[in-house]
Amino acid sequence: AGTPFEHVALKDVSFCVERGEFIGIIGHTGSGKSTLMQHLNGLLKPTDGSVLLDGQDIWSDKRLTKQSRFRVGLVFQYPEYQLFEETVYKDIAFGPKNMGLDPAEIDRRVREAAGFVGITEQQLEVSPFDLSGGQKRRVAIAGVIAMEPDVLILDEPAAGLDPEGREDILKNIDAYRKSKNATIMMVSHSMSDVARLSDRLLVLNGSELVIDDTP
């Protein structure tokens, strides 16, 4: 039975995503953007409907659910608050280590991910807590990129950064997309960023997908 507090966070939301697309997602606070993102990489399980990755329901098998969390990378808003390791290198390596990769492959991924976001070799050996806010943001994004996800979902990746830092982060994200033919799904309140970068725009309102079109 329903309760007085029950709320449908997403209603009749259906769309397909192609490899290599850059998709902008916009909507007012409470429109369902964060809920949508967390469904796409298996953090939340839909009470109705399904999430398909390469045509397979990610909840049909525990192995597929686990794989989806590596293949669909999720960067929360202000991800720098989730840094915890003693060096930048170790923080970026955390995800690849959890994937069970060998040390040489982990090292390759860490250095490549650092390169994508503009982290230098010298910075890899310092504490992430000694870096500026913008640099911490880069480290946090690199930690997800190092898992080489097919789909990279980002919640306001440029929030709180100065104009130069904002532009750098967005360029880094697009460079990853082009290099790996990855799909980017980016939540943003900046219509100019979305219009400039996206191939496609999803607009959520009142828990429903109201627009799915080119910007």
Regions found by a protein language model. Name each.
Residues N41:
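Helix-to-loop junction immediately C-terminal to a conserved catalytic motif
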Residues S50-Q67:
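ABC ATPase NBD Q-loop/coupling interface
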Residues A104-Q122:
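Conserved ABC ATPase "signature" region
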Residues S127-L131, Q135:
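Conserved ABC ATPase signature
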Residues L152-D155:
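Catalytic Walker B motif of ABC-type/P-loop ATPase nucleotide-binding domains
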Residues V194-R196:
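A short, surface-exposed alpha-helical micro-motif characterized by mixed small hydrophobic
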Residues G206-S207:
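Conserved ABC ATPase "signature" C-loop
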